[in-house]
Amino acid sequence: MLSLLAASLAADPIYWTDLGLRPGIDLGFFTLRYYSLAYLIGVIFAYWHTSKMLKQPGAPMAQRHADDLFFYCTLGVILGGRLGYAAFYTGGATGIPSAFTDFSGDGFVSWRLLRLWDGGMSFHGGLLGVTAAMFYVAWRDKLNFIRVVDYVCVGVPMGMLLGRLANFVNGELWGRASDMPWAMVFPGADDLARHPSQLYQAGLEGLALLVILLLLFWKTRARYRPGLLAGVFTLGMGISRFVNEFFRQPDAQLADFAARTGLSMGQWLTLPLILTGLIVVLFALRKPPLASGTTAPA
């Protein structure tokens, strides 16, 4: 039955296995996973680009603040992403314990939660973790929180771009069944040709949003309007993820939830992002811009 449906959807689909992709680089003593490498390169790029932006007039913080900030942000994205996935996306069904329901016999969360190499990271959890890290550093060093977010968020889409490309290389998080010419058959996807939704996400929330934010920072005076860059990032990320969820196959353990509510878990979690981003952008545009000579604590 499934094979007949696959044949009707795509007469000559692309087979992911024919691409010769591997999940990592074999270094002999261990395999460097592309997903881990994507996180590493994303953090390095964001740090490098933020340091470059801080050399421009009107920066909200000094380099020493950025050094501390990216240490805490790295912890925030890893811990927040993992805890967010366990809390919102598992229900204990994938080997990653739910932070709310799957406790060990002695009352503590299972150590399986720490097995990052098994996969499972939530964008929304990572976003909350990074936001908490930025808030802590801004509060501790008496920095303008929203302007710190403005600068940090510009480089974030690079990490999203690389992360989604890594998902594609791993053959995971594929999309819904499709008859488009570029539809692909992924391992474990019931031999159905599907949308390569990882590439859609890489293009929308990665490349497109990165270009928009870079142009706003380097070619306009957006950085002198506190909250504008942060709002555009939040709004753009929310819209990109909401749209892409229509092409992405819902998580198996949440398929019933999506069927009952009409939207996926990712879309429900994204709606507050869209609303928040829109409000922040409107407020940023209503206020007069800062003077070019505005400086931050050294």
Regions found by a protein language model. Give the residues of each.
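Hydrophobic, membrane-interfacing alpha helices
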Residues: L2-A298
